[in-house]
Amino acid sequence: MNKLAIYLFLLLILSNCGFDNKQLEDQNVNSKIIFEKSKIIKKELNSNLKIKLNKLTKGEVFLGNNTNSTGNINFETNFKKTSSYKFSSIDEFDFNQPELIFTNDESLVFFDGDGSIFKVNKELKEIWKVNYYTKKEKKLKPIIYLAQSDKKIIAADNLSRINLINLKDGSLIKSIENNTGFNSNIKVFKERFFIVDFDNIIRCYSTKDGSELWNFITENPFIKSKKKLSLIIKGELVFFINSIGDLTALNINNGSLYWQTPTQSNLIYQDAFTLENSDLVF
């Protein structure tokens, strides 16, 4: 009797299992895929599309424009004549986003992977090339941010130094040391320039003698972000976004706070090193 009961019990369980599987099969037949896994597009989109740009802006000069990160570019779309200039490669070029500068004497200034700064003319012929780093510093592969102020080149690096360099011959005018490196573009306004360092401090320096005129401290995360920050000037205000996404507007003359607002959630504070900020543009 006990064996018969056990047999019937097992038969009942197996029958139920079979019924459940039948239900699952019916459900699978009637099911529909709502979300599909995205596929990587390997083909170039709009490969035949051609855009001719005569002028990017109207009424705004290119040199010294402070209303966006890199300035406005007026150019002709005739590439029949090309030139090249070879220099040692820069580590993590796309990540660091280094930018060359156009000077008011119709030349270009940039740097190479060893920290050498060079000036070339319109035909990319070298005018001068200098390097003011020690052998040990060269191995660190400094990233340099450049700007022009009158007859000076301002060269700030991610090692903690700002060099003021003579535009004509590349000679060193003055070297300024900071407590930490810099990681933003440089903006020049009248006789001062502005830059942000790794501690989320915006600093204002004199273009005449390199003295610090004022600074403004914003919230500083424990983990330092190496991503380049954005800095612009509009009217009498300087705007910058720090590594945790806070957008700040300051009085350009004395650094007093005009307003400040976060652009990210509070959770971003813990993940500041993964935050990728956009460039500021007016």
Model-derived segments and their meaning:
Residues 21, 44, 59, 81-102, ...:
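Extracytoplasmic beta-rich repeat domains
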Residues 18-25:
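Bacterial lipoprotein signal-peptidase II cleavage site
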Residues 13-16:
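C-terminal motif of bacterial Sec signal peptides marking the signal peptidase cleavage site
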Residues 27-43, 47-83:
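Blade/loop signatures of beta-propeller domains
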Residues 66, 104, 112-113, 150, ...:
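Structural signature of WD-repeat beta-propellers
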Residues 121-125, 166-170, 206-210, 251-255:
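Short loop/turn segments that connect beta-strands within beta-propeller blades
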Residues 2-11:
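Sec-dependent signal peptide recognition
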